[in-house]
Amino acid sequence: MLENLCTLPLSADLFAQALHPEKPLLTVGLSSGHVHTFSLPPAKKDGKGLIKEIWSTRRHKGSCRCLVYGHDGKALYSAGTDCIVKHFDPETGKVKSKINIPKRGNHDDPPAIMHALTPKTLLLGTDSGALYILDLLKDGSLSPEPVRKHMPHDDYVTSITPLPPSAESTSGFSKQWVSTGGSTLAVTDVRSGIMARSEDQEDELLCSAIIPSGLGPKKMRGNAVVAVGTGSGVLTMWDRGSWDDQQERIYVAGGRGKKEPESLDCIVRVPASHGSGTKVAVGVGDGSVCIVDLRRREVELTLRHDEVEGVTAIGFDCYDRMISGGGKVVKVWAEADSPEEAESEDDDEDGSSKKRQRDDDDDSDDSDSDDDSSEDEKPAKSNSKRRKGKGPLPGTIAFPGLD
């Protein structure tokens, strides 16, 4: 069972969220164009710790729509409605390189999605439906111009999910990916281009995640399966290699008598440490997070991120804690202690309290003061992300009930 450890308030609506692959770092991009990076507390048994802001800046004029870490976590990339892609240091926020997004004719073509496919390849999708392939240099810097351009869908790309590399792969990195956009799913190869495109699903396909093995058809359990979230609240299942049409449907937030279907806006595979490795966490338009067991084809657990705003981003950090984002809030979730563990911790705390009273020492804890501050700037006018709508940010946020 997952429980909410803490809630991190934001100064503007969340448009993008990225998690460092190896360190407890969370970076958020806001509707105001600001980008903030926070250090999450380590996963200690006592649960004590602080969320600390490492740096913040107004990275883009307009909104920051996309954020992604490089494969090794040494580079961070952002893209905004100013039609600029920036590469910067995750620890300091210092910009190292930047490029302009190609125009669509004489008009700007703002970003819709970004994904680091390999250490040498960055994928960038735009509002016009273009999908650009960008080369990355040895230090993670951006190449001046895209090396390829594809149009896999009639609308903008809503999700990108790499397919597992083949057994013949020498690099160990994927060269193919599944994308969704409009009402279709497509498969693209970094060299060969668009390889497959599904039939019209007559429903908006919004997000996707892959289960590498364990869910394929009989006698092919090792075959990968892609789960796709839709605008009607239904999760569709696709077998690798059978890209014409979906194979199964799971009703998560719509269908089968549900009054108001809610969109499934984001999805992530739940780590095997939380179960069988065949579950996904889905962010829903009504502000809930659903844990879906794909093997049993059912919703296992529903959590509440927000009462009003939908969940627009979801992921797991390096300690397998779930991070959900939406509206002006980010929440951190972790496995709840079992009753036996909780009772044991209470006993330990009682004993420690009595010992402190006996010792009567006068030691004091040193506290770090963060004097970093961002410039006072008026927030930019909110820009809609993907054609839909939005006091200073505190430097440290404590877990509820803890020092």
Swiss-Prot record:
Which compartments does it reside in? Nucleus, Nucleolus
Which keywords accompany this UniProt record? Nucleus, Repeat, WD repeat
Indicate whether Repeat appears among the record's keywords: yes
Which residues lie in Acidic residues bias regions?
337-350, 360-375
Q: Which SMART domains match?
A: WD40 (SM00320)
- Major localisation: nucleus
Q: Does the keyword Repeat apply?
A: yes
According to the record, where are the WD repeats?
A: 9-48, 59-98, 105-144, 200-248, 306-343
> What are the start and end residues of every segment in region (Disordered)?
335-403
Q: Which InterPro entries match?
A: WD40/YVTN_repeat-like_dom_sf, WD40_repeat_dom_sf, WD40_rpt, WDR55_POC1
**CC per GO annotation:** nucleolus
Q: Which family is it part of?
A: Belongs to the WD repeat WDR55 family.
Which PANTHER family does the entry mention? WD REPEAT-CONTAINING PROTEIN 55 (PTHR44019:SF20)
Identification of the protein by name? WD repeat-containing protein JIP5
Organism of origin is Pyricularia oryzae (strain 70-15 / ATCC MYA-4617 / FGSC 8958) (Rice blast fungus)
Q: Which gene encodes it?
A: JIP5
